[in-house]
């Protein structure tokens, strides 16, 4: 707030307000309008352009590209609170600065990446989860009270809908799988966890 920012949670955007060919704000599901010089969406392009705009507000090329965009695979998000950083000494040696590790990518081979995609495309939980891990508390310690760290992990590729199960049924198993994979690279990871959740 001291920087002039207000973050609202559970504020569903119903429509982008367009005036004179430019986005001028958003209308929330409850009817409230928020005006702004800049409108940015963190929703995927299909959801943004197909549900938040009227078709006549967009040019034909944008509509065609949005319609042709394939969205047959997705991801899950793994969030964790840890009492210490992942120990990567087996890969980086004993002299590395743990606080300098902001991003970690787990994708050991092209074949691993391809298998992750194939699993998702066939509606299965990925047997080879590709991970994009961020530990923002290494550069912004105010994200946690006292000691400890937080992790945000985008896990690719996972199908939006599972073929023979549901995400509700698989959420805990997927979380355990993610913990096991990270622990192959950082053996202290499981014991460092204070809490974790998986979002689908």
Residue spans for each PLM region:
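Flavin (primarily FAD) cofactor-binding/catalytic cores of flavoenzymes
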Residues: 11
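General small-molecule cofactor/ligand-binding pocket signal
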Residues: 6-8, 194
């Amino acid at each position: 707030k001291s920087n002039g920012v207000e973050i609202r949670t559970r504020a569903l955007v119903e429509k982008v307000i367009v005036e004179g060919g430019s986005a001028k704000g958003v209308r929330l599901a409850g009817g409230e309008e928020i005006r702004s010089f800049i409108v940015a969406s963190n929703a995927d392009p299909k959801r943004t352009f197909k549900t938040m705009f009227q078709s006549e507000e967009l040019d034909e090329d944008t509509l065609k590209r949005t319609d042709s965009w394939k969205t047959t695979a997705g991801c899950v998000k793994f969030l964790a609170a840890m009492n210490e950083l992942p120990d990567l000494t087996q890969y980086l040696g004993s002299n590395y600065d743990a606080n300098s590790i902001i991003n970690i990518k787990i994708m050991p081979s092209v074949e691993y990446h391809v298998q992750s995609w194939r699993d998702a495309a066939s509606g299965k939980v990925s047997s080879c989860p590709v991970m994009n891990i961020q530990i923002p508390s290494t550069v912004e310690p105010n994200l946690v009270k006292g000691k400890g760290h937080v992790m945000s992990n985008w896990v690719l590729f996972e199908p939006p809908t599972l073929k023979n199960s549901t995400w509700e049924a698989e959420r805990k198993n997927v979380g355990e799988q993610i913990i096991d994979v990270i622990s192959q690279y950082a053996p202290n990871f499981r014991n460092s966890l204070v809490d974790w959740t998986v979002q689908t």
